[in-house]
Amino acid sequence: MKLLVVDDNPDILQILCSIITLFGHGVDAAGDGLEAIRLLQQDRYDVVVTDADMPRVDGIQLCRFVKAQRPDIHIIGMSGDLSALKEMENAGADFCLSKPFGLDEIRSAIEKRFRASSSPHAFAAGNSETQAG
């Protein structure tokens, strides 16, 4: 399974990419929604994990773009703002995480999207207490 992680905070971006790699999945990173759109047009992804509040193109706009252009891609939204999470759900996010979240929460969200994509690959689960957000 291949994921695209989108966040304007480079620390969160690096942590999430490292965690997803440990889970055994391919991952690309984008610093905002505009960069994510470029990557989505160039490559194939199963899941997009995106923050809500970003410059240029925010996560809500990105959700709308993904659902309009690639409805087969699952979206996991992230934000510390509950109203932004609701907006992301309304824009097409399949699942939302409130920041900060723990490793088990992101793993569970990815695993659910993994199962929904019917991929034949096995999901590797780690057992750490790392937090992102």
Indicate where each model-derived feature is located.
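C-terminal output helix
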Residues: F101-K112, S118
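As written
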Residues: G59, E89-L97
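Two-component/phosphorelay signaling modules centered on CheY-like receiver
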Residues: P10-D28
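Acidic catalytic/metal-coordinating carboxylates
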Residues: G31-E35, D58-L62
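Receiver (REC) domain active-site loop signature in two-component systems and cognate sites
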Residues: M54
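CheY-like receiver
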Residues: S117-G133
